[in-house]
Amino acid sequence: LTEEVREKRGLSYSVYSQFAPGLNAGAFAISLQTRPDQAAEALKVSRQVLERFVADGPTEAELQAAKDNLIGGFALRIDSNRKLLGNVVNIATNGLPLDYLDGWTDRIAALTVADVRAAMARKLQPQRMVTVVLGAQP
C-alpha cells in the first residue's frame, strides 16, 4: 500500500491496513488520509493492491520482513498490565490455550508464504467488503 499509494502516486502521506481477527470474520481496514479530489483514485489503487495481495500473497522477502517486525516487537505487546490483560481477553474470547503467548514467536517464525496465502484466501474477500469514506466532497 505504501509503495503504490504514497510513494508512486503521492496520494497520501500515510496508508496502512490492519486486521482484527476473531472467531467470526473479523474486521479488516485500510486507512489513509488524502485530499478530496484524490479520494477516488486513492480508493481505486488501494482496492487494486488488496486484490493483488489476496490473489498473489506476499513475497518471501515481504513475509520475512513482517515476521522480523512481529517477533522483534513481541516484548512491546506484553510490556504493561493493560497489554497483558488485552492478551488474556484475546485468549479467553477466542478459546486459545492458556500458554498461547509462550509459543507465539515460534508460530510466527514457522509461517510460510503458503500459510499466509491460504489464510488470506479464507479471511479476506475484497468483493464482500464494505467501503466507508469520510470527508468532504471533491
For each feature predicted by the language model, list its residue ranges.
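Bilobed periplasmic-binding protein-like "clamshell/Venus-flytrap" ligand-binding domains
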Residues: 115-133
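M16 family metallopeptidases and their MPP-like homologs
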Residues: 2-110, 127-135
